[in-house]
Amino acid sequence: MLQVYLVRHGETEWNVARRIQGQSDSPLTAMGVRQAQQVAERVKSAGITHIISSDLGRTCQTAEIIAQACRCDVITDPRLRELDMGVLEQREIATLNTQEEAWRKSLIDGTPDGRIPQGESMVELANRMQAALNSCLALPEHSRPLLVSHGIALGCLLSTVLGLPAYAERRLRLRNCSISRVDYQNSPWLANGWVIETAGDVSHLTDIALDEVQR
């Protein structure tokens, strides 16, 4: 059985400012660094053999902290990037007009082929995330990889593992530096292939989550 850990990056300056990041970038806050350190402490004894990260700065920064504890190098894979949010990237959510907010909402409300102009659809996102996950099957036997990616990207991936359409309503909260795990197995009581073992675990984090403060 192959176990793959999935980690969202730590809190960023733009998370705090409620700016749309997408494939643009923002550095981790001090809390984000602390969150990554707590992930590292949690997984350092889990037998992680590979750290594979989105090539965006916030994920690489998170991955490097985890990799030091696990004594692994960081491998980057652009397929693990966040959803491309097109013309709305770098915008503060509070500044969006009615049309722009409708574009943003179409990504999370179940709209088939919802997208922001010049951005990706959830189906396009799911296709590359699934390809990145499936590439773990080619790793040497007994590998235990950890992938560092993004909130919408990981939520979409987990939804499709459950058999939901990529554009299904977004109902899974994956907080900064949450840990999920998917296993590839043949089981008499589960569908063969990828199954979800855990999703959105934050028991290793000590600070109040940003989305608890910003309700």
Curated annotation (Swiss-Prot):
Keywords: Glycolysis, Isomerase. The keyword Isomerase applies. It catalyses: (2R)-2-phosphoglycerate = (2R)-3-phosphoglycerate. This is Probable phosphoglycerate mutase GpmB. The active site is at H9 (tele-phosphohistidine intermediate), E82 (proton donor/acceptor). One of its GO terms (molecular function) is phosphoglycerate mutase activity. Pathway: Carbohydrate degradation; glycolysis; pyruvate from D-glyceraldehyde 3-phosphate: step 3/5. The record marks H150 as: Transition state stabilizer. Pfam families: His_Phos_1 (PF00300).
